[in-house]
Each structure stands twice: as C-alpha cells, then as structure tokens.
Amino acid sequence: MTSSHAMNITPLAQLALLFSTLLLPGTQALLAPTTPDAGSALNLTFDPWTRTLTWACDTAAGNVTVTSCTVTSREAGIHRRVSPFGCRCWFRRMMALHHGVTLDVNGTVGGAAAHWRLSFVNEGAAGSGAENLTCEIRAARFLSCAWREGPAAPADVRYSLRVLNSTGHDVARCMADPGDDVITQCIANDLSLLGSEAYLVVTGRSGAGPVRFLDDVVATKALERLGPPRDVTASCNSSHCTVSWAPPSTWASLTARDFQFEVQWQSAEPGSTPRKVLVVEETRLAFPSPAPHGGHKVKVRAGDTRMKHWGEWSPAHPLEAEDTRVPGALLYAVTACAVLLCALALGVTCRRFEVTRRLFPPIPGIRDKVSDDVRVNPETLRKDLLQP
C-alpha cells in the first residue's frame, strides 16, 4: 500500500537531529561514499549533499600539494574539473549521482606528480531503489512529486524524498514515519527557497540491507505545468466570432513572448472535426463564424515556447451569436421617454410664447375714420373716389 505526504521546510534546528538519525545502523537514507583505497594518504571523503570532496591536510605523505579535482560519470555524462580551495574541492554545479561517480585528485608529493582516486557508488541491490521519479509545479504554488517502488525492493522498504536548491539547502522533505505505509508521492506547498535548478533525490531504508537511491537535477522552469488561461470570453455576430483570454498565473517569471496559445472550437455534433489555431504573443483571436450558427464551443490552452509543452485546457465556452434585436421592454421605455421629452419641449415652447406675448404685446394699428367705419360701403366709397 502506498500513501502521499505533504512536504514542509525543515527548520535548521531539526536538521542536525535528522542527520544523526539517518546515520543510525541499518539505514541507508544518507548517501555514503565508498573508496577502494582505504589506505589513501589523503583520506579522501565525498559529501554528496554539498558536492564537496575533502582530504586530510596533515597527511603522513609529506609535502602534498593538490592542483585539481575531477568528477566523472560516463553513464550520466559528467566530466568536471575544479581547483582546490584549502583542503577541499567543491563542485559548484549540481549533478545526478545514482549512476556512481569517480573522483580524481591530481597533485604533487615532494615535487613529484601524484594521483589519488575515490569511487562513489550507489550501494544496494539492483531494483531496490525507487524508479520513474517525476515532479511538477502546479497552480503556480506547489510542487508535486511521484515515483514507483522498485521491482526488487524489500518488503519493509521506506522511501524518503528530498528537494534541495543549488546551494544545498533543503527546499522540502518528505519522510514516512515509523510504522507508516510506503510512500510514493509528496507535495511541497512552500517553494520560497526554490531557485532556477533543483536537486531531487529519493532514498530508501530497509532492515534487509542498503537500498539504492534515485536522484536527478532539473531546471525548475521545466517542471512547471501551466494552468488554463484566465478570463476566457467568447462572442459572435453574423459574420465573425471573437475569443479573448488572459495568460495563466505562473510560478516562474514569464513574459508575453514566452507564451503561446492554442484555440480550439468544435461543433457539439458527434464525429465533428475540431478546428485549431496557434496564437503567439496575442491574447485575442477573431475568426469567421462557424456554420451552422450555434452549437459550437471553444476552449483555450497555454504553452511555454521554450519548454515545448502545453498546459491544461480552459472550460469550453459556447459560441453564440449576439442577439441584435431590441428587447420589447427597452423599446417601450425609449418610446415613453421620447413622448415625455416631446411633451416637455412643447410645454416649454408654449410657455415661452405666452411669456413673450405678455412682455411684448402687439402694437395697435392706425385706424382710418372713413375706411374703417363699418357703416361705409366699400364699393360706394371707391366710386366716390374715382369721380372727377
């Protein structure tokens, strides 16, 4: 039976206690170096956690001068040379060690060239260690790791996972408590110490003997799995559809050029062929309205242009044509407002006319005593005027 544990940052005060526990007999949680030359004059030792090779400065060999250190692993493709600092060599770059490495030290003894070698091996029976270690950063906030129990693992095997940053500090740790079932999953909720690279190692312990470890060095950007794009909207008119979205939240710092998007729309009819369009450096896409109108859905997913992997699809959104008809209630309200405005305008106009007439009454005309007399016949008056 397997189980999963959450990983948390281990306080420094508890780190020493953990190391002393790991060094108890019968455990193999701590990677231990081995050397075929126990009588080496330098007494070489290698710390896999810090990638530091040390030796005794006060050797019995006399005047010893170390000029360089080299680590080699043909299986892992490792070949690095560094210069010593004091009585140690530090291999700055992280490296996977489960294939085993050979450490060579070059120098002089009393002026004569000398060479020393230390072999670091992965102790334990083949197939006892974990396999298929995979880790992912999801939702821009937590690290999820999983592995598979080794095919030849002892019945009482218990696995532990450690995640270290490039300086050798613990980012997270997951261990099975005594009596718990074997664990093959872990989740780390605090990634504040995680840098651009991470060293992942799954160790095992068993009362039956040593258990091989499994480790890997990964670029943290390669671990991130993008979530679905945010704020996806879709609308159509009689000729075109428009889809817009926002990039997903990310743990790593990404720019607009780092994103690419894939837009897919498909009819709801069984057996219909989906249409896909790749969008780069944009968060909007317009395309002709698919026929027949209605019954289509669209979804969007994001990808990292550098890591060449795609994230999760957004929920499907229907592609529906916008209703261009004016609602009846809105039409009634607009008509009522127009009538009211006309009535108000007419009322204001009439009132202004009445006020103007009162302020400026009409000037009466000059009356003619003869022509304006209603008792005078106009025809008779014309004849009288025309007579000489």
Curated annotation (Swiss-Prot):
Annotated TM spans: 328-348
Membrane topology classification: Single-pass type I membrane protein
Signal peptide feature range: 1-29
Assembly with partners or alone: Heterodimer of an alpha and a beta subunit. The beta subunit is common to the IL3, IL5 and GM-CSF receptors. The signaling GM-CSF receptor complex is a dodecamer of two head-to-head hexamers of two alpha, two beta, and two ligand subunits.
Annotated function: Low affinity receptor for granulocyte-macrophage colony-stimulating factor. Transduces a signal that results in the proliferation, differentiation, and functional activation of hematopoietic cells.
Free-text domain note: The WSXWS motif appears to be necessary for proper protein folding and thereby efficient intracellular transport and cell-surface receptor binding. The box 1 motif is required for JAK interaction and/or activation.
Name of the protein described by the UniProt record: Granulocyte-macrophage colony-stimulating factor receptor subunit alpha
Domain named Fibronectin type-III: residues: 228-324
Protein location: Membrane
